[in-house]
């Protein structure tokens, strides 16, 4: 943990400083976020008390330009120390937004100012990065999440309009399962903080090409989406363009994953964009897509199967690259220590639970392959901070060219990803399920 003196020294390098709100005069920030308690109306006369950014959830869209420095001021008006993680950005540990890397919390009643040059281009997001334990109102269970889009220097895009959509689950309760473990169930599931039919529709016109940026901000649950009468042409995963854009009938997003997809608006009417699983859509997860000059009850068409495959979007040639590039292999085995009887499990990487997991040293500039072996009965959406990795193998199938920062490793399977250690200092690796992270599913890499 970095003390204040060490942090201020790091600040001169990283471009951020922590101040009392009445401390120093600043030039106006490009963006201002205020963390505070609020009450959100998710359905008619149904309110959720939560913590959010700027009294809204999702928080405001932060739209940046690649390579153009920005300053963000974050004021914490909540009762708890807080922290903001800039998910998917390449930032120094002092401002990445993970206490485990050395980013300081923002104390209650204080402010922090972050100045950085945003990269890489693409659809990113920001969110809290604290522990929740058994309190299903805190951390990622809360409304502390928002969109962040970094526009590329030279590509204006080729679409008629775009929408940003956040999937979230609210008002969780821990319940016991047959194996004795405790898992959350939710009262409401929303898109952009509203249940199906309560929020404003996505208004479109026939012939338009609409770009959808979708992020799963749920603390624990994956989500399946379909748009009745239409298909999604997936063009980016986790904000990174895919080698082989393809049209699919449905999307699958684990916690923290993002999908950018084009939709050709070629079937006029009023449709439902919603969760494929009936019980989740019944909890509210959906939004109306309304063509101009059309009205009436939104139409839903229930898919008969659940289909999703990352590898559809990989390069046509999935063979191993030739050459003399050395790739260092790091095996990471995921399993759990069952506790049961109403208690939380302990999640482990290579037999250890954080903070006792090994900090693995990396050499700057070298290439590494992480070999994930999931020996547990749960799926794990694992996230590597401060890097983008290339997916190389999933469940025995090879691929190339798919760049992500979060990947779902299904129960009982193996996956492999590669990245170059190009970010000096500590980088956190963890499962993005809040309950798994809280119960020890974390470790650090140290690049020197």
Where are these regions (language model features)?
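C-terminal segment of N-terminal export signals and the immediately downstream linker at the start
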Residues: 1, 18-49
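N-terminal secretory signal peptides and thylakoid transit peptides that target proteins
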Residues: 1-15
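Extended terminal and domain-junction accessory segments
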Residues: 10, 18, 24-32, 135, ...
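N-terminal edge beta-strand
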Residues: 45-63, 188-202, 341-364
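Extracytoplasmic beta-sandwich strand-turn segments characteristic of Greek-key/jelly-roll folds
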Residues: 57, 61-63, 88-120, 197-202, ...
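Asparagine-centered strand-capping/turn motif at beta-strand->loop junctions
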Residues: 74-78, 216, 372-376
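Hydrophobic or amphipathic alpha-helical targeting/insertion segments
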Residues: 114, 118-150
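Acidic-aromatic/histidine active-site loop/patch
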Residues: 161-208, 215-219, 337, 345-350
């Amino acid at each position: 943990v970095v003390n204040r003196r060490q942090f201020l020294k790091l600040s001169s390098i990283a471009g951020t400083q922590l101040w009392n709100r009445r401390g120093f005069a600043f030039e106006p920030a490009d963006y201002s976020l205020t963390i505070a308690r609020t009450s959100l109306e998710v359905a008619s006369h149904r309110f959720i008390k939560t913590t959010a950014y700027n009294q809204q959830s999702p928080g405001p869209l932060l739209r940046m330009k690649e390579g153009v420095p920005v300053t963000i001021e974050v004021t914490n008006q909540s009762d708890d120390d807080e922290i903001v993680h800039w998910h998917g950005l390449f930032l120094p540990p002092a401002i990445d937004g993970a206490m485990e890397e050395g980013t300081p919390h923002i104390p209650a009643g204080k402010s922090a100012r972050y100045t950085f040059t945003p990269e890489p281009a693409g659809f990113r997001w920001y969110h809290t990065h604290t522990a929740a334990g058994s309190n299903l109102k805190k951390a990622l269970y809360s409304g502390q999440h928002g969109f962040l889009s970094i526009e590329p220097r030279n590509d204006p895009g080729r679409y008629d309009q775009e929408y940003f959509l956040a999937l979230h689950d609210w008002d969780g309760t821990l319940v016991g399962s047959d194996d004795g473990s405790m898992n959350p169930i939710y009262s409401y599931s929303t898109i952009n903080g509203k249940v199906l039919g309560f929020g404003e529709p996505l208004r479109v016109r026939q012939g338009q090409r609409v770009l959808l940026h979708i992020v799963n901000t749920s603390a624990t649950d994956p989500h399946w989406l379909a748009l009745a009468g239409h298909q999604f042409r997936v063009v980016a995963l986790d904000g990174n363009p895919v080698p082989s854009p393809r049209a699919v009938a449905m999307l699958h997003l684990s916690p923290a994953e993002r999908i950018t997809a084009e939709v050709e608006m070629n079937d006029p009417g009023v449709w439902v964009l919603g969760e494929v699983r009936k019980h989740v859509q019944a909890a509210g997860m959906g939004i109306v897509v309304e063509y101009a000059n059309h009205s009436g009850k939104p139409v839903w068409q229930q898919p008969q199967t659940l289909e999703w495959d990352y590898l559809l979007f990989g390069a046509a040639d999935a063979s191993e690259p030739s050459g003399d590039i050395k790739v260092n292999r790091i095996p990471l085995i995921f399993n759990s220590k069952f506790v049961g009887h109403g208690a939380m499990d302990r999640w482990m990487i290579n037999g250890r639970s954080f903070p006792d997991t090994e900090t693995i040293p990396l050499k700057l500039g070298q290439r590494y392959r992480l070999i994930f072996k999931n020996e547990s009965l749960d799926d794990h959406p694992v996230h590597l901070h401060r890097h983008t990795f290339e997916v190389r193998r999933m469940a025995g199938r090879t691929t190339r060219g798919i760049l992500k920062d979060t990947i779902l490793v299904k129960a009982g399977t193996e996956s492999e990803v590669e990245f170059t250690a190009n970010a000096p200092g500590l980088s956190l690796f963890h499962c993005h399920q809040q309950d798994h992270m809280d119960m020890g599913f974390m470790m650090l890499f140290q690049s020197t």
